[in-house]
Amino acid sequence: MVNQLEMLYEGKAKKIYATDKEDMVIVHYKDDATAFNGEKKAQIESKGVLNNEITSLIFEMLNKEGIKTHFVEKLNDRDQLCKKVEIVPLEVIVRNVAAGSMAKRLGLEEGYELKTTVFELSYKDDSLGDPLINDYHAVGIGATTFEELNKIYEITAKVNEILKEAFKKQNINLIDFKLEFGRYNGEILLADEISPDTCRFWDATTGEKMDKDRFRRDMGNVINGYREVLNRLRN
């Protein structure tokens, strides 16, 4: 049993709290929804509850598959106990199908099947709009090392294969998603969350979107999409 102490950090969708165990934190999932680097904001009732449950199920699955993550256990509807990591200030964006900003940037039709999975790297800085960078930028600015980045890409590739297969069984296409990583006792761990906030999930039969694009694009029924992802994961 751990006890929650002071808040260490508040992000767009989560709060991080210290605990009486120095190497553990409590991650609290909020109902806040944001898009376009915080320009669009709303409260969506139960979003935090659903994202906590979805992320917990996915991290439990990844842990069983040998992927080392920061996740320890789900504590309640909104809270997880996680290892306290030093976040690598990078996001790895994994694209299996062209959609969103990549489709727009490269003039591709949304839904275009990429010839190979594409990894993109962005520098985590809201004031700069999380700009896309390459490996040399990442190492050059001191965000990581080539050795660490190779490890991150190795984990990313494994996670992509595991998740694609898992969601395929639930008739969901994993279009793209973003991952974050942290350092813990000299190791690289998968961190943050994996949820409809951070992934594009399309129904494999109808193409219906079941993710944050429903909020970004004012499609309505945002929470129904999240709930559908959770219901299928539970099967």
UniProtKB/Swiss-Prot annotation:
The gene is purC. It catalyses: 5-amino-1-(5-phospho-D-ribosyl)imidazole-4-carboxylate + L-aspartate + ATP = (2S)-2-[5-amino-1-(5-phospho-beta-D-ribosyl)imidazole-4-carboxamido]succinate + ADP + phosphate + 2 H(+). Its EC number is 6.3.2.6. One of its GO terms (biological process) is 'de novo' IMP biosynthetic process. This is Phosphoribosylaminoimidazole-succinocarboxamide synthase. Pathway: Purine metabolism; IMP biosynthesis via de novo pathway; 5-amino-1-(5-phospho-D-ribosyl)imidazole-4-carboxamide from 5-amino-1-(5-phospho-D-ribosyl)imidazole-4-carboxylate: step 1/2. GO terms for molecular function: ATP binding; phosphoribosylaminoimidazolesuccinocarboxamide synthase activity. It holds the Pfam family SAICAR_synt. PANTHER family: MULTIFUNCTIONAL PROTEIN ADE2, SI:DKEY-6E2.2. Belongs to the SAICAR synthetase family. NCBIfam families: purC. Keywords: ATP-binding, Ligase, Nucleotide-binding, Purine biosynthesis.
